[in-house]
Curated annotation (Swiss-Prot):
Primary localization: cytoplasm
Protein name in the entry: ATP phosphoribosyltransferase regulatory subunit
Coiled coil segments of this chain: none
Its biological purpose: Required for the first step of histidine biosynthesis. May allow the feedback regulation of ATP phosphoribosyltransferase activity by histidine.
Taxonomy, superkingdom: Bacteria
Transmembrane feature ranges: none
Species the sequence originates in: Staphylococcus aureus (strain bovine RF122 / ET3-1)
Any single Pfam family the record assigns to this protein: tRNA-synt_His
GO biological process: L-histidine biosynthetic process
Gene Ontology annotations for the cellular component aspect, listed alphabetically: cytoplasm
Other observations noted: This function is generally fulfilled by the C-terminal part of HisG, which is missing in some bacteria such as this one.
Subunit structure: Heteromultimer composed of HisG and HisZ subunits.
Pathway as given in its UniProt record: Amino-acid biosynthesis; L-histidine biosynthesis; L-histidine from 5-phospho-alpha-D-ribose 1-diphosphate: step 1/9
Amino acid sequence: MNNSEQLIALKESETAFLKYFNKADYELVDFSVVEKLDWKQLNHEDLQQMGERNFWQHEHQIYAIRNDFTDQLLRYYSMYPTAATKVAYTGLIIRNNEAAVQVGLENYAPSLANVQQSLKLFIQFIQQQLRDNVYFVVLGHYQLLDALLDKSLQTPDILSMIEERNLSGLVTYLSTEHPIVQILKENTQQQLNVLEHYIPNDHPALVELKIWERWLHTQGYKDIHLDITAQPPRSYYTGLFIQCHFAENESRVLTGGYYKGSIEGFGLGLTL
């Protein structure tokens, strides 16, 4: 496929995504890639993000290039509430001076059934339009870390070692028998079963993970991995997250996660 054909295919995929989810009764939204920001309303995390964003000042006003759709929509709907419970979008994101086209969905005040239906529809779109299918799924939950590791041990060094799966370092700091070490020693496909030995069966994170595992099995997905190493990109990501990896295009990943800040939601996004 030459450059012109790739460009046409990309634009067709964007349009097809909007048509597909318009037909499924999602509200289509189109926001400017340039965000107008108010310094007084930016929190510590917003300021930290500026390292990967292009921003400038003009006549006492700050402008920044969009780097995250969920974040932009959350900020906008916090100021201008919407009655929509499910929205679909396409457009550019720019991170660290690299541009990409993203398509995605947001479920507001989400129920489990609505989120799972959104994921099901998203995968069907990928199968039909992008001619690809889910190869394996990664599940995780941002409450697991607190369930497995005492707050006093959640130092930058230890968190970094967990993220890097540095078992030798973790053994030194935590001990061989520590739950995190024991879980990370297992194959990621087995870790969800092993997790049950280290946190109560009624822990909300474990309950939610098992519900999703069972649902994914009913959808025909058996290759499911647990990730206990991921740390939330923003503090409002407090619950379950999912990554669907694909068979044909290994670099393409459908990602999703629950968040609760000024708005509660569950977002799903795919970079084309």
